[in-house]
Amino acid sequence: MATFHFDLVSPEKLAFSGEVDQVDIPGVEGDFGVLAGHAPVVAAIRPGILTVTTAGRHEKIIVLGGLAEVSEKGLTVLADVATSLDELDRAQFAETIAEMEEGLKEHEGGELDLAIERLDHYKSIQQQLSSTAMH
């Protein structure tokens, strides 16, 4: 299988850089996969789990929004936050969700809609983390 270069960058670090077979991205308009030779595109990403496939090995990384750009040079994802499952403190993640639920009382109108949408994304990630597919 042909490979391509992939960089995953967050404000804190270069989370991943290297040659990969495939990257599956949680897009705002729907999840999508990138292979070598993919058409150029820029897409917004939603909070979710990004999967990097290299030589049959899958690495899952939580991203909390950002942008993905596919070009002739490869794929670059600029993520608001990027955390590998090995680095994730699951108890802290669950606490963040609880705090978000409590904080819903402070929002109304459009702000409430956005807060609920973000909470739903976090809960979806938590559910994926609990599934057997993540092991």
Swiss-Prot record:
GO terms under biological process: proton motive force-driven ATP synthesis
Classification via InterPro entries: ATP_synth_F1_dsu/esu (IPR001469), ATP_synth_F1_dsu/esu_N (IPR020546), ATPsynth_dsu/esu_N (IPR036771)
A molecular function GO annotation: ATP binding
Keyword set includes Cell membrane: yes
Lipid bilayer topology: Peripheral membrane protein
GO cellular component: plasma membrane; proton-transporting ATP synthase complex
Major subcellular site: membrane
Domain of life: Bacteria
Residue ranges of the TM segments: none
Keyword Endoplasmic reticulum among record annotations: no
CDD domains assigned to the protein according to its UniProt record, in alphabetical order: F1-ATPase_delta
Cellular localization per UniProt: Cell inner membrane
Record SUPFAM superfamilies: Epsilon subunit of F1F0-ATP synthase N-terminal domain
Keyword vocabulary terms for this entry: ATP synthesis, Cell inner membrane, Cell membrane, CF(1), Hydrogen ion transport, Ion transport, Membrane, Transport
Signal peptide: none
Family the UniProt entry places it in: Belongs to the ATPase epsilon chain family.
Free-text function comment from the UniProt entry: Produces ATP from ADP in the presence of a proton gradient across the membrane.
Subunit structure: F-type ATPases have 2 components, CF(1) - the catalytic core - and CF(0) - the membrane proton channel. CF(1) has five subunits: alpha(3), beta(3), gamma(1), delta(1), epsilon(1). CF(0) has three main subunits: a, b and c.
Entry protein name: ATP synthase epsilon chain
